[in-house]
UniProtKB/Swiss-Prot annotation:
GO biological process: glutamine biosynthetic process
Annotated ranges, domain GS catalytic: 110-446
Lineage: superkingdom: Bacteria
Organism field: Thermus thermophilus (strain ATCC 27634 / DSM 579 / HB8)
Protein's recorded name: Glutamine synthetase
Location within or outside the cell: Cytoplasm
Transmembrane intervals: none
Length: 446
């Protein structure tokens, strides 16, 4: 829903809102906010609130740190009581774009990075890129001191019901809070692993979807805290069970119609769809550092846990990196299965859009789809079908990112440089850390 400044001011007064939260994300996808009281509402809506960009990961140097927060009125929402206790004063939220004081958009703002790629697709003649995510998360118990543990709150499995699924009450509160904030929830259920959950919300244009993912993650964490639980979007918190992914369904629309659908083509997939899929395959290795950005991400991308490890596509096969769900017509889409929910949603959707756009611009075509279970294919069979492997570690993913000029250009030089620097430091720290596994394995023997 679109709002005007006058409508927002009226709603703030009518609902007795005391605080307005201005929200952004850093390049790592962590939500940040500046909160202003009633006296500053009009100034905030005029985009005149300044903040120190040098304090935000990947933003600016200290000598050029003044930044402006310009709110997107379409993201206005009054936070429900489940999220913020009204006894302390009602709170509203606006997601902001970041600008320099001279009025230029800040190239290090992840939201701006995504907007650039959306405009690229519009220049190719498309209405927009649409995305539907499936974010998974774990609910863990907390210690008496409030610290998170990796002890699951249940022993339930896929689609199980209470009382086996002890997270059902928390999950319902999450759904109620999200609905109150304008989400259209399609399904909520227990996932395969103990303590693992999924809440699916309706697809939307890419920018709205990125905003929704960022909002979803902090709402889920807040509601979990209300129930004495810790919600984590860490991809693989426990060895030996399924990790958490964020399968993302993608489609392009043109003149109000799904541009991926062609009723007369093989698989009923248009040339546009094939070009887009080919672009995703071409740049899979280069963009995985963005869609799967943690050291821990690559412990999920291993055989045997329903996560892809090979760069391939299929009309139905879930072992492939890209799957084409059965629905056609307006619902024709490509499901990208490797992303995980630790990613920055703006940057992740930006590189997906860039990869697809490159496929369309160069008229790339994918190899034949793989219908067999790729996990059961031999190395020779995979080579025969020209199936490449996804990077197996964050280090390999960063090397692939360095070699992909399309993904680099999509991120922009500022984000590319700061993201790469932060992730290289993360890998270096991990590499020199002595882990418990090493002590358990070697200490007594050597």
């Amino acid at each position: 829903m679109g709002y005007t400044k006058a409508e927002i001011l009226k709603a703030l007064k009518g609902e007795n809102v005391k605080f307005l939260r201005l929200q952004i994300t850093d390049i790592l996808g962590v939500v940040k906010n500046v909160e202003v009281p009633e006296s500053q509402f009009e100034k905030a809506l005029d985009g005149e609130i300044m903040f120190d960009g040098s304090s935000i990961e990947g933003f600016t140097r200290i000598e050029e740190s003044d930044m402006l927060l310009r709110p997107d009125y379409n993201t206005f929402v009054i936070l429900p009581d489940l999220v913020e206790d009204p006894k302390r004063g009602r709170v509203a939220r606006l997601i902001c774009d970041v600008y320099y004081p001279d009025g230029r958009p800040f190239e290090g703002d992840p939201r701006y990075v995504l907007k650039r790629q959306i405009e690229r697709l519009k220049k190719l003649g498309f209405d927009n890129l649409y995305a539907g995510p499936e974010p998974e998360f774990f609910l863990f118990l907390r210690t008496p001191e409030g610290l998170p543990t990796t002890e699951t709150h249940d022993r339930a499995g896929y689609f199980d019901l209470a009382p086996i699924d002890k997270g059902e009450e928390a999950r319902r509160d999450m759904v109620n809070a999200l609905v109150a904030m304008g989400f259209e929830i399609e399904a909520a259920h227990h996932e395969v692993a103990p303590g693992q959950h999924e809440i699916d919300f309706k697809y939307a244009d890419a920018l709205t979807t990125a905003d929704n993912i960022a909002t979803f993650k902090w709402v889920v964490k807040r509601i979990a805290l209300n129930h004495g639980l810790h919600a984590t979007f860490l991809p693989k918190p426990i060895r030996g069970i399924n990790g958490s992914g964020m399968h993302t369904h993608l489609s392009l629309f043109k003149d109000g119609e799904n541009a991926f659908y062609d009723p007369n083509a093989e698989y009923q997939l248009s040339q546009t769809a094939l070009h887009f899929i080919a672009g995703l395959l071409e740049h899979a290795a280069g963009m995985v550092a963005v869609t799967n950005p943690l050291v821990n991400s690559y412990k999920r991308l291993t055989p045997g846990y329903e996560a892809p490890t090979n760069i391939a596509w299929s009309a139905s096969n879930r072992s492939a990196m890209i799957r084409i769900p059965a629905r056609r017509g307006v619902g024709t889409r490509a499901e990208l299965r490797m992303p995980d929910p630790s990613c920055n949603p703006y940057l992740a959707l930006a590189v997906m859009a860039a990869a697809g756009a490159d496929g369309i611009e160069r008229k790339l075509l994918p190899p034949p789809p793989i219908q067999r279970n790729i996990y059961q294919m031999t190395v020779r069979e995979r080579r025969k079908h020209k199936i490449r492997e996804l990077p197996g570690t964050l280090r390999e993913a960063l090397e692939a990112l360095r070699k992909d000029p399309v993904i680099r250009e999509a991120l922009g030089e500022h984000v590319y440089t700061h993201f790469l620097q932060a992730k290289q430091m993360e890998w270096d720290d991990y590499r020199v850390t002595v882990h418990q596994w090493e002590l358990d394995r070697y200490l007594a023997t050597y």
